[in-house]
Structure formats: structure tokens, C-alpha cells
Amino acid sequence: NSEIKLSWKKVSGASGYSVCMRKNGKYPQIADVKSGSTLTYTVKNLPNATRENFKVRAYKTVKGKKVYGVYSDNWNTATNPQPAKGLKVSSVSYNSVKLSWTKIGCTNYRVFQLKNGQWKEIAKTTDTSYTVKNLSQKTTYKFKIRACKTDDKKANHYGKYSAEVSATTSKAPAVVTPVSQ
């Protein structure tokens, strides 16, 4: 499951804030932030790969009753995509490794390679396969991927990493040298 952290600017004189999430076209309250100085709320246990809409409004407590202000602008945001899965090595040569994986709902996939003990992003693709080229012969390489979903505000949301896979490149073919006649 995913979580989304909402934050807003302080409203002068507010006793607290009502956090609302769209459901069936309405915005019922999902949280009561009971401090006018608390300016964030994290919504937890949201399903992966969904779009969610939120609004926040300040309130002031007057004689024991809450008097609400107007709603904020709408937050329309995406939750993290599902974890990437099904990563496997499809083919190996002396200088390349072809990876493939299972399609899930996301904007693109990020491919990572373990280099000098650190995972480095080496590619971004919308396909469900990628060929890593220019590798050294007879060398073992490790790879993993993760899905990325981009929301309306161009913010990226990442799923969990796949399990890693490894592949060992083969020995380069012998070079045939022609003999002159």
C-alpha cells in the first residue's frame, strides 16, 4: 500500500484542520488535525497505482463548536505504482544482457545496475524489456527495476524495487584471421 503526505500553509487563528478525501463525488473528512500549528498530514494505507483527490479546510473552535473556513484547492495526486515484478534475464551474450519483466500500470520503468557496490539507474523505458549493452565478457552483473508513475504536476512516484537478478556474460567469440594465399 501507499501513503501520501499533504502539507499546507498556516491559517491565522485556526484551531485545527479538517482533511477530506474524495469518495463518490463528495469530500468526507478522513482526519481531524487538532492543532492550528500542525501543517501536515500523512494519509496511509492507500491502494497502489491509483489517483486520489484531497481538500483541507481550517476551522476555529468557538464556544465548543467548530466553525469551518473554505476548502483549499484540490490536491490531485497519484499513489505509488505496484512493485515491479517478474524481472528475468531473457538472453545473454559476451557483451550484452537482455532483461524482461511483467507489465504493470505505470508511466515508465527504471532499470538499475549494481556498479562498484552501488545501484545506479542506467535506463528509463516504457517497454517491458531492456538490453544492457557494452558489457565486458565473462563478467557477472546484477540488475533490478522499479516502476515510476508521473502525476499531473509532473512529480514522480516510485514503486518498490523488484527482486534483483544476475547474469554472467559469455566469452567473446574467437576472431578468425584470414590467411593470405
Locations of regions flagged by a protein language model:
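Pro/Thr/Ser/Gly-rich low-complexity, intrinsically disordered linker/stalk tracts
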Residues: 1-13, 48, 66-105, 137, ...
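An aromatic-rich alpha-helical recognition segment common to small helix-rich domains
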Residues: 8, 19, 43, 55-56, ...
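Extracellular low-complexity, O-glycosylation-prone stalks/linkers
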Residues: 13-31, 103-122, 126-127, 144-146
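Acidic surface patches and DE-rich sequence motifs
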Residues: 23, 61-62, 114-115, 149, ...
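Short, solvent-exposed loop/turn segments that connect beta-strands within catalytic domains
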Residues: 25-26, 63-67, 117-118, 152-157
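Short proline/glycine- and polar residue-rich coil/turn motifs
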Residues: 34-37
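Short strand-edge motifs at loop-to-beta-strand transitions and within beta-strands
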Residues: 39-41, 128-130
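Beta-strand-rich modules
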Residues: 43-64, 132-152
